[in-house]
Amino acid sequence: MFGLKVKNAEADTAKSNEKLQGAEATGSSTTSGSGQSTQRGGSSGDTKVKALQVAVKKKSGSQGNSGDQGTEQVELESNDLANAPIKRGSNPASPTQGSRLRHHPIQFGIWSIRHPHPLKAVACDRANSQGPPQMIRLDPHSVRCALCL
């Protein structure tokens, strides 16, 4: 269906320089794209990712090889997240800044440090649910990860 038809193919007798002509063969499906470069880096905020335009020529099955049916313009969306700044260390509720958490995000949950079956795990104490998680020693046979079940 998406084959390339070539007419007037000529080859020399040694078959070392084979010429193919007819790149614009009629009835063939052709995909052409024109991409524009993406610029990254720099301190200016005018860096943008430009969209890629793709032209697709369709061939109708009922008309055979009579010609091109039409050309669709497909425009891909620009990816603005590629140029977004990376924010590191901007958690306002981190315990390193001196503020204590009101409700701990991992209340009464066990998070293993090493896999599989660790001797130590991070767990929240029920009496200290507003503070940072406490390191407690657990029996390795009582701690199981979700992948080992």
Curated annotation (Swiss-Prot):
Biased composition (Basic and acidic residues): 7-18
Annotated region described as Disordered, given as residue ranges: 1-103
Residue stretches of biased makeup (Low complexity): 26-41
Composition bias type Polar residues, residue spans: 61-72
Source domain of life: Bacteria
Similarity comment: Belongs to the adhesin P1 family.
Protein's recorded name: Uncharacterized protein MPN_128
Annotated organism of origin: Mycoplasma pneumoniae (strain ATCC 29342 / M129 / Subtype 1) (Mycoplasmoides pneumoniae)
